[in-house]
A protein has these predicted regions:
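Sec-dependent N-terminal signal peptides
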Residues: 4-15
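Glycan-recognition patch characteristic of GH18 chitinases/ENGases
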Residues: 20-109
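Short, acidic/polar
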Residues: 29-43, 98-115, 177-189, 313-327
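Solvent-exposed loop/turn segments at secondary-structure junctions
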Residues: 30-33, 54-58, 87-91, 128-132, ...
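Conserved, mostly hydrophobic/aromatic
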Residues: 49, 124, 196, 237, ...
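Aromatic-lined substrate-binding rim segments of carbohydrate-active enzymes
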Residues: 57-86, 129-158, 217, 344
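Substrate-binding surface in catalytic domains of secreted glycosidases
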Residues: 130-278
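Glycan-binding loop/region signatures in secreted carbohydrate-active enzymes
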Residues: 243-324, 346, 354
């Protein structure tokens, strides 16, 4: 009985420790000055730093390297660093996935660089993948994870959300499943990697009509779908920090498929925008900040050149609702793209790293 009681205390203590450290705050960082400055200012709030430092081509050649100042500060603060390795396009990744020799070269380079630089591990950020490469992506991920684990390193992967697990009816839904969402076998990937970062953002982009970067129901649906296949302790919820600004772009000259004549065509555009720039735009053109209660997101519209333009962005309230969702679902953490675009108020919500 005494031993059972002792084991029970150990289990309770372990659960309490996990609760104290979750959700782990994973932040992405690019090499832009704004992104690096944000990291330098808020490093104590970050649980894992994921910088965009590496890429791989069709031959398995890994290129890139760390920002020395960023890496030095992270190491001084004992902040885990897990850089991204990104693919060089759909065709290059397809070739890599079919070439065992190239994969071995990539894996050896990742292990070597991780040990040399003192990284926690590496994150795969492979996007724009054909759904027909689903199995080979899972296989390469397993090979890489096995090699990393053998050296005491970790492998994570960023995945495009893919609920409900099949293509929709419309042409756009079919295209985005074939070329973006369908390549990720969450169950197979979860068996190999240490963490899956669910990229629950870019619901609406330049490819779509104006709308939230990550609407509430869409976010919840994709999170719950992922939880069917991924253990909670291996799942991180994507929370965007940025927004989009939709406007009427300059008409473009293209050949009409029917007449074969060059004609002007519409060019509705959507530009990536930081929260700071969004608020500046609203002030300049007298936009009134709105709150969409259904989608838990901030937005406004302005008039410029007599045309209505739309902005959906992430303010502190938008971030907080999704942060609380990660807490309520008791998942490992959240992953936010990207430092330098955030509302400064989010940092008041986050505890210091333990």
């Amino acid at each position: 009985m005494k031993r059972i009681f002792q084991l029970l205390l150990v289990v309770i203590a372990t659960v309490c420790m996990q609760a104290e450290t979750r959700p782990v705050a994973l932040f992405y960082m690019t090499d832009t000055p704004d992104s690096v400055r944000s990291f330098l200012a808020h490093s104590s709030k970050i649980g894992i730093l994921v910088p965009t430092w590496y890429s791989v081509d069709a031959t398995g050649l890994v290129t890139g390297g760390p920002n020395p100042a960023v890496l030095e500060l992270a190491q001084k603060q004992h902040l885990p660093v897990m850089p991204i390795i990104a693919n060089a396009g759909k065709d290059a990744l397809h070739t890599l996935l079919a070439n065992g020799t190239a994969q071995k070269a990539m894996i050896a380079a990742l292990v070597r660089e991780s040990k040399l630089q003192g990284y926690m591990g590496i994150q795969f950020d492979f996007e724009d993948i054909s759904w027909t490469d689903r199995d080979t992506l899972s296989a390469m991920t397993k090979l890489t994870a096995d090699a990393m684990h053998a050296e005491g390193l970790q492998l994570s992967i960023a995945t495009v959300p893919n609920a409900p697990g099949y293509a929709g009816k419309g042409g756009f839904a079919k295209w985005i499943y074939e070329d973006w969402r369908g390549a990720y076998d969450l169950q197979a990937l979860a068996q190999s990697v240490d963490l899956i970062c669910l990229m629950t953002y870019d619901q609406h982009t330049r490819w779509t009509p104006p709308g939230p970067v990550a609407g509430w129901d869409w976010t919840v649906e994709n999170l719950d779908y992922a939880l069917k296949f991924v253990p909670k302790e291996k799942l991180s919820l994507g929370i965007p920090l940025y927004g989009y600004h939709w406007f009427a772009g300059s008409p473009v000259m293209r050949e009409d498929p029917a007449t074969k004549k060059l004609e002007y065509h519409p060019n509705i555009s959507a530009n990536y925008i930081s929260t700071e720039d969004a608020l500046l735009l609203a002030r300049e053109y007298k936009g009134v900040a709105q709150w969409d209660a259904a989608d838990h997101t901030a937005w406004f519209f302005i008039y410029r050149d007599q045309m209505r333009e739309w902005v959906f962005y992430t303010n502190t309230r938008t971030f907080e609702d999704r942060y609380k969702l990660a807490q309520e679902r008791a998942i490992e953490g959240f992953c936010s793209w990207v430092l330098g675009t955030e509302d400064s108020g989010i940092w008041e919500l986050l505890p210091d790293r333990k």
